[in-house]
């Protein structure tokens, strides 16, 4: 460029920046200034950089993604083969790949990222950033083996530069992918390797603490995935201690910590989001352990924190956290007999999913929404609706635990509908699948419970006792309180049915104690009915009257709540089984409530551990 062209170029750049930073920004004039640069036929480097700048501006300030894409594609084509032009070249590749993904064209993003990775081997920062991004792209497309391979390449590439922090980040990210793949043995091996590095090799105390949080989140999720609620307690306490350290007032800002060197600029999640995530895994643990009050308390705190963060900057990951928290709190409401709140929150979860970019969350969570609607319909004795919702869930998901959970609840629906052939098919299918792969201890305990419930309904009392003792053994080993209370109350009913009042009382008493602690209104309803019969058999009229009054109170509360929720427009969501959920629902006909007499004692359902948090984020 001549000196006069140089001056024009600098002036136009200055003007563009002036218009961009004006209050309010004048993006149209900013873009016009940048486009005017092309009239001077600038050198390739200047042309490529200008196309990148236009792409950045268009993506950040406008909805004209097609024009942004055009500029970024030109920037990539021009810069791809220019030496000593790393920032423009790799920034372009990264941004273009992001845009392709936004347009749901990850097949175009992958070759761009692969080429950029190949060209960036001399630049540790960009090489690692692009490896993370491509791994994330494959993980989003559920190509977990490819994502894992790329993260393994990242581990190897950091060996050459002795970047210990970055190596640990790659290891933990790979462990996360393997958790999704259910490679239990490999997860433990990698977590142990990463844990040793965090303790002995990472010198920076601030980076060490962030890695600890990442490590403990994965460890806690791993144990919860296996249904090991008791085993996880130590790791959960350590996680809570680490997050308290990071959130302390004297802890430096993220910007001060992640910027000391190129290999330390990578962050899994900022501390405010980690804070929400720790609440989330604590809620998950409380749910599985059967502490609904605790789960509710932590959910409310987490949702408050999410709203606070949204008011500052509405990051997509916050909606992911919100939807998983809502999934948990909805199950709490159903266990506690509060269907009217549950259906309102299901509708809220649906709205959160619909409001996400390109309905991304709806695609990820439609199966969970159907499952929650199935549980809601089941608890309200709308069994045909529950059946359709569980089928929709099973057809929508590839997640093994969610399929198993939906099938177990579907089995209870068939049991209540006296459809023995379909029930037998489900139980045989679950049995066959369980022989081929390991499942969550909580879910397998639930499977034995459903078999025990089935045997009880067939009056096969000896077989029912055998299944329920197996359930109790698994539940007691890991402090699965809700599973324990459900099993004890059913076992009590078994003993009552064979006339063994002493053993029946020995079972129902701890069942009621646990149920009031959870609290689980369905077990309390069932247990109070058993106690009424037991006290009548034992000729204890005062205690019989007390048990009868308790039973009436539980029953009336459930009936009143059901009458209330069936009048809500949100109740019609139980008819949604395919496509996008309806919006709005106010004009839709409200389904009539079934007779109150259909609320039966054996309405206990199984509680699901929701999809594990953090799986959607490898690098941000």
Swiss-Prot record:
Belongs to the SCC4/mau-2 family. GO terms for biological process: cell division; chromosome segregation; maintenance of mitotic sister chromatid cohesion. It is found in: Nucleus, Nucleoplasm. TPR repeats lie at residues 90-123, 445-478, 485-518. Component of the cohesin loading complex. Required for association of the cohesin complex with chromatin during interphase. Plays a role in sister chromatid cohesion and normal progression through prometaphase. One of its GO terms (cellular component) is chromatin. InterPro entries: MAU2, TPR-like_helical_dom_sf. Keywords: Cell cycle, Cell division, Chromosome partition, Mitosis, Nucleus, Repeat, TPR repeat. This is MAU2 chromatid cohesion factor homolog. It comes from Aedes aegypti (Yellowfever mosquito). Its main location: nucleus.
């Amino acid at each position: 460029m001549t000196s006069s062209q140089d001056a024009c170029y600098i002036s136009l750049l200055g003007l563009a920046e002036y218009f961009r930073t004006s209050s309010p920004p004048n993006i149209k004039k900013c873009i016009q200034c940048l486009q005017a640069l092309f009239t001077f036929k600038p050198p390739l480097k200047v042309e490529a950089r200008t196309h990148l700048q236009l792409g950045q501006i268009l993506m950040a300030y406008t909805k004209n993604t097609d024009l942004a894409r055009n500029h970024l594609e030109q920037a990539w084509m021009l810069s791809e083969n220019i030496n000593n032009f790393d920032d423009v070249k790799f920034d372009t590749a990264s941004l273009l790949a992001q845009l392709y993904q936004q347009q749901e064209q990850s097949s175009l993003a992958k070759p761009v990222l692969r080429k950029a990775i190949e060209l960036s081997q001399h630049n540790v920062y960009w090489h690692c950033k692009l490896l993370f991004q491509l791994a994330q792209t494959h993980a989003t497309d559920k190509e977990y083996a490819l994502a894992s391979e790329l993260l393994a390449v990242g581990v190897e590439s950091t060996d050459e530069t002795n970047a210990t922090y970055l190596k640990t980040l790659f290891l933990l990210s790979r462990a996360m992918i393997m958790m999704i793949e259910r490679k239990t043995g490999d997860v433990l091996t990698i977590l142990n390797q990463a844990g040793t590095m965090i303790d002995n090799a990472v010198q920076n105390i601030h980076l060490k603490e962030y890695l600890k949080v990442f490590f403990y989140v994965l460890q806690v999720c791993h144990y919860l995935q296996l249904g090991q609620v008791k085993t996880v307690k130590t790791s959960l306490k350590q996680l809570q201690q680490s997050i308290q350290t990071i959130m302390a007032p004297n802890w430096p800002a993220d910007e001060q910590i992640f910027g000391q060197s190129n290999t330390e600029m990578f962050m899994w999640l900022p501390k405010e989001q980690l804070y929400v995530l720790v609440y989330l895994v604590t809620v998950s643990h409380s749910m599985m352990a059967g502490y609904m009050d605790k789960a509710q308390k932590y959910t409310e705190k987490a949702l408050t924190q999410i709203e606070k963060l949204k008011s500052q900057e509405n990051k997509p990951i916050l909606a992911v956290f919100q939807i998983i928290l809502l999934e948990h709190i909805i199950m709490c409401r159903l266990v506690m007999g509060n269907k009217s709140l549950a259906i309102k929150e299901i509708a809220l979860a649906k709205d959160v999913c619909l409001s996400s970019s390109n309905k991304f969350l709806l695609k990820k969570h439609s199966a969970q929404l159907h499952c929650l609607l199935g549980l809601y319909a089941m608890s309200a004795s709308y069994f045909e609706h529950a059946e359709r919702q569980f089928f929709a869930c099973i057809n929508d998901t590839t997640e093994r635990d969610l399929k198993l959970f939906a099938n177990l609840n579907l089995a209870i629906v068939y049991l209540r509908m006296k459809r023995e052939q379909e029930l037998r098919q489900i139980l045989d299918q679950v049995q066959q699948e369980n022989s081929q792969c390991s499942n969550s201890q909580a879910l397998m305990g639930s499977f034995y419970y459903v078999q025990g419930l089935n045997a009880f309904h067939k009056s096969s009392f000896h077989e029912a006792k055998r299944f329920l003792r197996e359930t109790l053994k698994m539940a007691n080993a890991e402090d699965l309180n809700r599973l324990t209370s459900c099993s004890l109350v059913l076992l009590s009913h078994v003993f009552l049915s064979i006339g063994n009042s002493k053993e029946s009382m020995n079972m129902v008493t701890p069942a009621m104690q646990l149920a009031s602690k959870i609290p689980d209104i369905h077990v309390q309803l069932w247990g109070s009915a058993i106690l009424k019969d037991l006290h009548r058999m034992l000729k204890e009229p005062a205690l019989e009257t007390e048990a009868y009054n308790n039973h009436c109170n539980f029953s009336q509360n459930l009936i009143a709540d059901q009458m209330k929720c069936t009048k809500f427009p949100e109740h019609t969501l139980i008819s949604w089984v395919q496509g996008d959920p309806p919006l709005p629902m106010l004009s839709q006909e409200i389904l009539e409530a079934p007779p109150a007499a259909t609320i039966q004692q054996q309405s206990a359902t199984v509680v699901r551990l929701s999809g594990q948090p953090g799986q959607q984020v490898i690098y941000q």
